[in-house]
UniProtKB/Swiss-Prot annotation:
A GO CC annotation given for this chain: plasma membrane
Protein name in UniProt: Lipoprotein-releasing system ATP-binding protein LolD
Assigned protein family: Belongs to the ABC transporter superfamily. Lipoprotein translocase (TC 3.A.1.125) family.
One Pfam family recorded for the sequence: ABC_tran
Entry keyword Secreted: no
Stored InterPro entries: AAA+_ATPase, ABC_transporter-like_ATP-bd, ABC_transporter-like_CS, ABC_transpr_LolD-like, LolD_lipo_ATP-bd, MacB-like_ATP-bd, P-loop_NTPase
Residue positions binding ATP: 41-48
Domain ABC transporter: 5-235
Record gene name: lolD
Record flagged with keyword Metal-binding: no
EC numbers, comma separated: 7.6.2.-
Organism: Vibrio parahaemolyticus serotype O3:K6 (strain RIMD 2210633)
Length: 235
């Protein structure tokens, strides 16, 4: 495998008045192209902050993030945005779908914003919604979908630009257990089909174990790394 993402000694300090709070305390790890990785940790352990830095949505106080061979902190904000829009996908605990638009329109939106023609954008969105099992729900608005269906739409939207890496922050936090398991199975299936890497942060050890590799975060540090041979077991 080739290195997709490299993190070296990532530290993040927030200052309020004279008080410094160190949220990340020197995080280092790599992700290979097409790899499925989870980071497990309780609320407040630094997982979401790390994800924001990896997605070029926030700056590290210290350390370096290289994505596709580029040092994120060395890029201008415009170049960061261009890299983010083309090579990264995002899935959150709350789906953040646009309430007045259908599932098809929500998935097509990133392409339309990027200047793709409406016909092409809708064709790509339709193909992805079919892939996530929602061909019968394309014309429904978010309020007409179940929680699991809304999150499937959010995943399809994250994939529509054909990113190299999807960053998922508690993507099943609002779903019941069985639906959450189905969403993780979907991510594995999409990974196998497209070789898109996934980095998922969660507090649920059982769900995290569905990824190829799990890392554990505690108090701003990766405290251990557990490898699972799920691919060989499944094969």
């Amino acid at each position: 495998m080739n290195k997709l993402l490299e993190c070296r000694d990532i530290r993040k300090v927030y200052r309020e008045g004279s008080l410094d709070t160190e949220v990340l305390k020197g995080v280092s790890f790599d992700i290979d192209k097409g790899e499925l990785v989870s980071i497990v940790g309780s609320s407040g352990s630094g997982k979401s902050t790390l994800l924001h830095i990896l997605g070029a949505l926030d700056d590290a106080t210290q350390g370096e993030v290289d994505f596709l061979g580029q040092n994120l902190s060395a890029l201008s904000s415009n170049k960061q945005a261009a890299l983010r829009n083309k090579h990264l996908g995002f899935v959150y605990q709350f789906h953040h779908l646009l309430a007045d638009f259908t599932a098809l329109e929500n998935v097509a939106m990133p392409l339309l914003i990027g200047g793709i023609k409406v016909t092409e954008a809708k064709q790509a969105a339709k193909a992805l919604l079919e892939k996530v099992g929602l061909s019968h729900r394309m014309d429904h608005r978010p309020s007409e979908l179940s929680g699991g269906e809304r999150q499937r739409v959010a995943i399809a939207r994250a994939l529509v630009n054909k990113p190299d890496l999807v960053l998922a922050d508690e993507p099943t936090g609002n779903l019941d257990h069985n639906t959450a398991l189905a969403i993780y199975d979907l991510m594995r299936e999409l990974n196998k089909e497209s070789n898109i890497a996934f980095l998922v942060v969660t507090h649920d050890n059982e769900l995290a174990a569905k990824m190829d590799r799990q890392m554990h975060m505690q108090d701003g540090l990766l405290v251990d790394r557990l490898m699972t041979e799920s691919a060989s077991v499944e094969g």
